[in-house]
């Protein structure tokens, strides 16, 4: 993958959605919740007012409506501003 986010943006690979409930019921694709965590795979350079706190490899939590979904090499990613990242886990 050859993509580099600009300014204060980060590229995140979302965690896989749950396939089954704790009781063993298989969840159909139409009912799966969007995961709210993922791994940082690329980081921009930041801005003159804001340094980048997150780094490649960090696992993070983000808001439900944060970011823009993109597809690269057949895989789904989210690109969002660092401010949309809620926490590093």
From Swiss-Prot:
Any one cellular-component term (Gene Ontology): cytoplasm
Cell location: Cytoplasm
Any GO molecular function: protein folding chaperone
GO BP, sorted A to Z: chaperone cofactor-dependent protein refolding
Matches recorded under InterPro entries: Chaperonin_GroES (IPR020818), Chaperonin_GroES_sf (IPR037124), Chaprnonin_Cpn10_CS (IPR018369), GroES-like_sf (IPR011032)
Keywords: Chaperone, Cytoplasm
UniProt xrefs under PROSITE patterns: CHAPERONINS_CPN10
Chief location: cytoplasm
Function: Together with the chaperonin GroEL, plays an essential role in assisting protein folding. The GroEL-GroES system forms a nano-cage that allows encapsulation of the non-native substrate proteins and provides a physical environment optimized to promote and accelerate protein folding. GroES binds to the apical surface of the GroEL ring, thereby capping the opening of the GroEL channel.
Subunit structure: Heptamer of 7 subunits arranged in a ring. Interacts with the chaperonin GroEL.
Entry similarity comment: Belongs to the GroES chaperonin family.
PANTHER family per the UniProt record, alphabetical: 10 KDA HEAT SHOCK PROTEIN (PTHR10772), CO-CHAPERONIN GROES (PTHR10772:SF58)
NCBIfam families associated with the record: PRK00364.2-2 (NF001531), PRK00364.2-4 (NF001533)
Name recorded for this polypeptide: Co-chaperonin GroES
Gene symbol of the encoding locus: groES
């Amino acid at each position: 993958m050859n993509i580099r986010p600009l300014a204060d943006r980060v590229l995140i690979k979302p965690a896989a959605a749950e396939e089954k409930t704790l009781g063993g019921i298989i969840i159909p694709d139409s009912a799966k919740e969007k995961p709210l965590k993922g791994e940082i795979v690329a980081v921009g350079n930041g801005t003159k007012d804001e340094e980048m706190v997150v780094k490649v490899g960090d696992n993070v939590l983000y808001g439900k409506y944060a970011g823009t979904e993109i597809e690269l090499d057949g895989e789904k990613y989210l690109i969002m501003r660092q401010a949309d990242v809620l926490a590093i886990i």
